[in-house]
Amino acid sequence: MHDHPDQEVPRRLEELPSFGGDIHVYHSAVATFYAPSDLCGTGGLRRELIRLTPSFYGHERRDTVFVVLDDSKDGMEGMEIGRVLLFFSFRYRRRDFSCALINWLVRDEEPDPDTGMWTVRLECDQRGQPTVEVIDLDTIARGAHLLPVYGSSKVPDNFSYHDALDSYNSFFVNHFIDHHAHEFITAS
């Protein structure tokens, strides 16, 4: 799916483009999207804040997002999930670039037969390290709500939801969080 691990990298630093400008870092981004069954607001347009903060109520917060990879495909067939590590922008050759650094979460081939929800897990490279990629901010459609696949063991009493994305191996993509998410994810 992602060709970045196999992509040929220039052998010498001199072959890379030179950049000496400023890089601006942000702790949030706003996703604006059309929710066809929600005509409140401006003709069905909705806004959603995607957070990436070092301290949100005393804990780090790194939201997950839907990344559109192929807009010719419906629902999850054309998207993947990413966990935002960094929002940043820069200017290069008189052009502005707004980007996000993300960890990819790859989905299973089919939704879970018991819940009807897609499941995702952190994508890792050949060494077991999470993959990261810089993407254009415009490819982020909206925030994604993930639920841990708990398994059969008991969740510890002192477990905090702040640690869920770092503590579980796989997650359900919750299309029941709101009616737009349901339409958006299950579109066919």
Ranges and model annotations:
Residues 1-188:
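Terminal interaction-prone segments of large eukaryotic proteins
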